[in-house]
Amino acid sequence: MKKGFSLPLWVTGAAKSAIKKLIGLPFEDYELIKIPKEKNLIKIKVHSAGLINEESQALGISFVDSGLDLDLTQNLEIWTIASLEKTYKTSNRPLDRINIIPGYGVGIDQKTSKICISDFAQKLLVENLLNIIPEGYTLNLEIVFPNGKFLAERTSNKSFGIVEGLSIIGTSAETFASASPDQLQNAKAQLKQIIANKVCDTIIFVIGENGLNLATSSNIKFPIIKVGNWIGPLLVDAAIQKIKTVILFGYHGKLIKLAGGIFHTHNHLADARIEILVYLAVKEEVPLEIIQKLSQSNTVEDALLVLESFSLSMADKLWNKLSDTIEKRSTEYINRYTKTDMKVGAIIFDRNRKIRWSGNNSKDYISAFKGF
């Protein structure tokens, strides 16, 4: 598989090139990017950099090469506009010297209007830009995705309160297709490392990038592994490795497939989310007229809104039942391949990134998640 790098690296490459141009250094068609807590440098190609606005600003441009042909951000054009502002305040906080501004096509939180950017992306910018900002100055860095607003319409960002464009939520340097064998091997390697280090006998399997961002920004003390679409094989591997408890953590639209026994969750292989929800609604004796509306819903999110508009308590009851069913079907799946006492829990968050539902096996753990 072709190797590629996540969105934050291409943003950082363009930004570094822009700042260097602004302070008078010659343009190079690549930048070496340092990854926090790692020794290696990654070479990121930069398309161009030049001075603009009467040389008061510099524009750096890069194009994402994620290595994944089906990735939404593949070939995404990135503009970073850098300017320096004299400051008379001293601060020990690195982010006080870098003002990250969401420009056109970059996602912001609908409630706060703050840029949607992961901790990894922020640390990456600080690691690579702080040392080249002249002493006594603050960097204003505007990030623009010219095609970001259009591309965001093809994501579930709005379900999470992210508007105006694409969020910058990459959490690692390299990219892996969620359905690729590389993703599976990477997750297995992480699991093996956790076991070798005897870190913990409870592990969090995170489904989806938003779930990973939510989990890693918390104070959860358990190890976290992003599992992509390879949930089934990784659950079996964890059981074989004698892990005591695995908590599945994710958005309801991602996890619902497990309740239907679908353990490779890529959409091109299987979907059936609405059908699974309708089946559970029938078992829970939801009124027929509501079941009919559920069956006509385009998305799981729409179905949840239908239920909540009818009865909040019924919606919560059904989604807790969904969590419980996920736990039971996961255990059944594992036992097809190996006999185990490993418990599988399921904790689900909603469109507002609010953690709301859990199954019987995860009731003792949900308070740890709700603590942030």
Swiss-Prot record:
Pathway: Cofactor biosynthesis; adenosylcobalamin biosynthesis; cob(II)yrinate a,c-diamide from sirohydrochlorin (anaerobic route): step 6/10. It catalyses: Co-precorrin-5B + S-adenosyl-L-methionine = Co-precorrin-6A + S-adenosyl-L-homocysteine. The keyword Methyltransferase applies. Its EC number is 2.1.1.195. Gene3D superfamilies: CbiD-like. It is an enzyme of class 2 (transferase). This is Cobalt-precorrin-5B C(1)-methyltransferase. The gene is cbiD.
